[in-house]
């Protein structure tokens, strides 16, 4: 079995690819069970966010994973291959540690990814697809993330995606305070965005969600209104700023709906930030003159502002991760030796019992105890020496040189 990470992220794949391989909540458990029941992996966890989709697995067939990944999303593996990365063993552990610590994020040092990773692990645990190896990996991962954040200032002055959305809105409108804001969805990202926009005291805030009951507690926190998604065609024209982040597999805001809204607004602009993957807004909306549409990838420049202040902390964080990876690999290699060590001990126990049984029988016959003990010790010595001497006798010249070195090292020999 082998620890392996396979996936795509904002470094390797554009949004148009990432949205095709995202695992929605309705598909996640199915995917985890498919992976493990098909024997492609004995353990599996899936991390799927707006910036990455990654499989963390314990597998005997790493080559089959990319094919499964493509097949699950009804894609051609040859078209997906240029965007995929496959990281084995220590590289997989290093990657997990870096992701959780925020070193691989679009926003260097951001903390939201750690919560998303914990949710992915909880989902895998609930699905029954975590075993000893992945449990240990993620236990170490969360410990390393905590150490990096407490020992460095990697997250200091970090600009979140939510804060970046506010900054972009301020570039479009003279004042957010005079605008009406619509938030589509009721998840963690929408909550963060509402927190940042509420600090600017917009004229009106409204939450639109598939189920208004789920949105109501969030809306009440910010003194916002609530509408169902079905009301969007009639309501969207009333809003200047729209932030959307749902788990919908299909777009919620179409070009036709927004064209009607712009006409109703007499071509007053609408600012939209689409933080969903797959996208909540049809891609064609970006071509409209009076709509300023920004995707997750478009926020990159804003969130990188101020990064210079945090880059100096990266080396210290990487040093912590390097040490932690070495420790984890040491544990993993030790675990891999357990069957061999157990086999050695079992063989030794069989030899011991065999010689002891012979000795008991000899003593029962009245044989001299000294002779019995001498015979038992010779028998044990011969049993334990048989394997190495037989190996040396039957090895090729190349194998023999390596065996001599190993046996000398194991038994502390110093051959002349």
UniProtKB/Swiss-Prot annotation:
It catalyses: (S)-4-amino-5-oxopentanoate + tRNA(Glu) + NADP(+) = L-glutamyl-tRNA(Glu) + NADPH + H(+). Substrate binds at residues 49-52, 105, 110-112, 116. Its EC number is 1.2.1.70. It is an enzyme of class 1 (oxidoreductase). The active site is at 50 (nucleophile). GO terms for molecular function: glutamyl-tRNA reductase activity; NADP binding. Pathway: Porphyrin-containing compound metabolism; protoporphyrin-IX biosynthesis; 5-aminolevulinate from L-glutamyl-tRNA(Glu): step 1/2. NADP(+) binds at residues 185-190. Keywords: NADP, Oxidoreductase, Porphyrin biosynthesis. It holds the Pfam family GlutR_N. PROSITE patterns: GLUTR. HAMAP family: Glu_tRNA_reductase (MF_00087). Homodimer. Belongs to the glutamyl-tRNA reductase family. During catalysis, the active site Cys acts as a nucleophile attacking the alpha-carbonyl group of tRNA-bound glutamate with the formation of a thioester intermediate between enzyme and glutamate, and the concomitant release of tRNA(Glu). The thioester intermediate is finally reduced by direct hydride transfer from NADPH, to form the product GSA. Catalyzes the NADPH-dependent reduction of glutamyl-tRNA(Glu) to glutamate 1-semialdehyde (GSA). NCBIfam families: hemA. This is Glutamyl-tRNA reductase. It comes from Thiobacillus denitrificans (strain ATCC 25259 / T1). The gene is hemA.
